[in-house]
Amino acid sequence: MVATIEQRTMRKIYWRILPFTGLLYFICYLDRVNVGFAALTMRQDLGLSQAALGLGMGTAFFIGYFLLEVPSNVILHKIGARLWIARIMITWGLISGATAFVSGEWSFYTVRFLLGLAEAGFFPGMILFFTYWFPPVHRGRIIAGFMTAIPISIALGAPVSTSIMELNGFLGLAGWKWLFLIEATPALLLGISCLLFLTDRPEKASWLAADEKAWLAAELKKEQREVEAERTYSVWQAMYNPRVIALAVIYFGIAAASVGLVMFLAQIVKELGLSNFWTGYASSIPYVVGTIGMIVAGFVTDRMGQRRWNCFALCLLAAAGLALAGLTHGTWWSIAALSIATIGFYGMKPSFWPMPSLFLTGTAAAAGIAWINALGNLAGTITPWVVGTIKDATGSFGGGLYALAGFAVLSAIVTVIGVPSTRRRAPRLTAVAEAAAE
């Protein structure tokens, strides 16, 4: 059967964009969280308290991240993803590598703050970039595929990072220094690759035929007309639009729950009586399950077209998994419960992130998406402290898991009361989805 123009076009775009951008995000997330593995020996070498370590890992990083999130995305919209994503990756690679040379508490705070500034705008920039290339019916799947980089980076990051740290003493450098130097290198190389490989807009794509460009331009223009027929927004109107604020609260709740879990997952799993080696592998199980759940959820949300109710159901699933983990912590049942929670965390994202583009376009979309991500990620400065405080007070992670479940319930409630219906008549799924998944 001769492929339709939609099938031909979208197959080319999926294979051109998804593997490369997924690799970028894998490296991005690994460079963000590898400090947790480095801390196994770095904390003692630098004389950092646990409080100082947490302040640098979370608070300093996310303050920097918050400050430049919106400006970064607006700049990307103006000058294009090719140059701006390359800039982001090269600067974060340099700063991540510079972490190898911190010498104490304040230099650690400074480099983490600078890393947050450098990385700001990468994720919302990618979400915005996808709106330039993918019609609405395809966005759930592309976001699902892209965001599988998070659970994969967590699942693989522990053994890779701890293996690098075995270089301790080589050329007179501590293992944690080698960790930062080696894992920063791919960001630098991929940043340069962005200049060669990324294409800002479909009209500049030499790898698309003229009829394919025309079809895609018509599809995206149709979406823009539908959105603008409802209303157009300035940057400031977008940032303070009630729907944008509601989406930010939803993302804050689910980010609070997921960040709180990932920070303490190893300690929760350690309660099963495992060695450090097997704790790492057991900790990866929920994220393998979450990866599968995200991919399936991406197909389901594009087929159904109802982003809001899919998001609501998966937020509740995350809450249920966390509550069950609180009930069963210290037993192997908690691994199953946490796997349910990760399906909810990651499965909701393919339904959630296409929603801003249902009512925002252009610069307003750039600002709105970045604002949602910036406000949501402020959760990273709060939840680890909440879980740790409850653990100190009660001696158990159960109460902390219940608190995280409460944040996920908040997201579910706001999804229902704060987000209007997102149902749009979506074209029938074509074979391109299956082709992209093969």
Regions found by a protein language model. Give the residues of each.
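Extracytoplasmic gate region of multi-pass secondary transporters
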Residues: 35-36, 236-295, 349, 353, ...
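Central cavity-lining transmembrane alpha-helices of secondary-active solute carriers
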Residues: 58-74, 284-297
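Cytoplasmic helix-loop-helix junction between adjacent transmembrane helices
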Residues: 111-148
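C-terminal transmembrane helical hairpin of 12-TM major facilitator-type secondary transporters
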Residues: 307-355
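Glycine-rich segments within core transmembrane alpha-helices of 12-TM secondary carriers
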Residues: 141-165, 186-187, 373-383
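Extracellular/periplasmic helix-loop-helix junction of adjacent transmembrane segments
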Residues: 36-67
